[in-house]
């Protein structure tokens, strides 16, 4: 007794899988991108690199590449690119972007402090109260004194000593807030 498959029916082992065709050039470009990501990782300090989600083999290869020179380093970078193919690059890329943006975030925070200082000098007590709410350890009397002094310096075209001092105090408060 023979079992014959119907013409329109497929056997379970013949199921079609969706095959995504990728050109050779696209594959090479992806590999180059992974190698460039690996190069950026090699350029990082070991203390920063410790925070990245990397496999042990990749971490060891990166540490080796940091010690190598010239041609050995080039070959090691290619090896890192090969190891990166087995890794998920997204978490690594996100961690790298976070480190890159740290500088711009610090700059933005300093710009906010400068704006706060300018408002403190122009508007006076209302803004000083805002600062006191945000930083309860701040010296209200010192801020008032410096704000008045900064206005006088600006009016008489003197060097902005109090202006700078307000900023330094705000910066110290901001930096100590994170601790």
Swiss-Prot record:
| Pfam families tied to this protein | DarP (PF04751)
Q: Which InterPro entries does the entry mention?
A: DarP (IPR006839), DarP_sf (IPR023153)
**Chief location of this protein?**
cytoplasm
Which SUPFAM superfamilies does the record cross-reference, listed alphabetically? Answer: PSPTO4464-like
| BP GO annotations | assembly of large subunit precursor of preribosome
Q: Which CDD domains match?
A: YjgA-like
Q: Name one GO molecular function term.
A: ribosome binding
Q: Name one GO cellular component term.
A: cytosol
Instruction: Determine if Membrane is one of this entry's keywords.
Output: no
Q: Where in the cell is it found?
A: Cytoplasm
Q: Name the UniProt key words of this record, in alphabetical order.
A: Cytoplasm, Ribosome biogenesis, RNA-binding, rRNA-binding
- Similarity field: Belongs to the DarP family.
Report the function annotation for this chain. Answer: Member of a network of 50S ribosomal subunit biogenesis factors which assembles along the 30S-50S interface, preventing incorrect 23S rRNA structures from forming. Promotes peptidyl transferase center (PTC) maturation.
Write down the PANTHER family for this protein, in alphabetical order: UPF0307 PROTEIN YJGA
Question: What protein is this chain from?
Answer: Dual-action ribosomal maturation protein DarP
Q: Which organism is it from?
A: Aliivibrio fischeri (strain ATCC 700601 / ES114)
Gene name on record?
Answer: darP
């Amino acid at each position: 007794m023979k079992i014959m498959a119907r013409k329109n029916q497929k056997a379970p082992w013949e199921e079609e899988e969706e095959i995504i065709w990728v050109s050779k050039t696209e594959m090479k470009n992806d590999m180059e991108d992974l190698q460039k990501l690996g190069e950026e990782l090699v350029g990082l300090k070991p203390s920063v690199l410790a925070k990245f989600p990397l496999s042990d083999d990749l971490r060891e290869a990166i540490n080796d590449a940091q010690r190598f020179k010239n041609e050995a380093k080039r070959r090691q970078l290619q090896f890192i690119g090969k190891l990166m193919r087995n890794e998920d690059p997204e978490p690594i890329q996100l961690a790298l972007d976070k480190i890159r943006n740290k500088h711009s975030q610090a700059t933005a925070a300093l710009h906010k402090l400068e704006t706060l200082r300018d408002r403190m000098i122009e508007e006076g007590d209302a803004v000083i109260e805002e600062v006191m709410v945000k930083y309860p350890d701040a010296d209200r009397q010192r801020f008032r004194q410096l704000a008045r002094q900064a206005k006088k310096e600006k009016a008489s075209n003197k060097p902005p000593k109090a202006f700078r001092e307000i900023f330094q105090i705000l910066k110290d408060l901001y930096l100590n807030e994170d601790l």
